[in-house]
């Protein structure tokens, strides 16, 4: 049986996979986490909502609702899915084809690859976004989801797990290198950030 998680448990368990996947991609860890929660969450038998509880995530390890598309050569899973028109009306896409993965980690990696491979997301400004809210709005413009409130929902979900995302999933900034050299009887210590300290030799 597939595992399910609270929102914070999900970030803790897959934080390292998320960090590796987003590093250098222009995709914010908070955006990825919030999308995974929204797309995979479902109601458990005890009435609580769990990440990984949706049929698509349980049966196909698809945590991001990514459809097959013509470029996909892997396994697939078909299921009905609800869509929303710009005017707010809804309709059901019957027997829609979704990507199927061997693991949640594979789903996380393919999410990043999917966004990078599709030029419409670059044109929409996804990879230039400086905040989760801004990136979510760009994803909506790029056609990732049809729900009119998608960007607001992503940002709200992110804020609920922000501390965990920053602790477990966000790429760590590299520390500056220590540089030592002597000049006029002083030892200059550079920390690789354009800042230097002068220390007189004893």
Functional labels for PLM-detected ranges:
Residues 2-174:
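Catalytic cores of secreted/periplasmic lytic hydrolases that degrade extracellular macromolecules
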């Amino acid at each position: 049986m597939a595992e399910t998680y609270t929102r914070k448990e999900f970030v803790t368990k897959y934080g390292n996979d998320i960090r590796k996947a987003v590093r250098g991609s222009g995709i914010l860890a908070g955006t990825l986490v919030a999308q995974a929660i929204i797309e995979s969450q479902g109601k458990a038998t005890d009435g609580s909502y769990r990440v990984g509880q949706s049929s698509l995530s349980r049966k196909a390890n698809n945590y991001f609702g990514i459809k097959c598309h013509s470029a996909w050569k892997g396994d697939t899973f078909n299921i009905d899915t609800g869509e929303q028109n710009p005017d707010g009306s809804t309709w059901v896409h019957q027997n829609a084809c979704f990507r199927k993965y061997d693991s949640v980690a594979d789903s996380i990696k393919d999410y990043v690859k999917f966004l990078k491979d599709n030029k419409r997301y670059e044109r929409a400004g996804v990879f230039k976004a400086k905040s989760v809210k801004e990136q979510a709005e760009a994803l909506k413009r790029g056609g990732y989801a049809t729900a009119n409130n998608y960007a607001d929902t992503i940002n709200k979900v992110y804020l609920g797990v922000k501390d965990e995302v920053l602790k477990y999933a966000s790429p760590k900034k590299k520390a500056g290198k220590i540089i030592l050299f002597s000049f006029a009887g002083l030892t200059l210590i550079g920390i690789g950030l354009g800042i230097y300290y002068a220390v007189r030799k004893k």
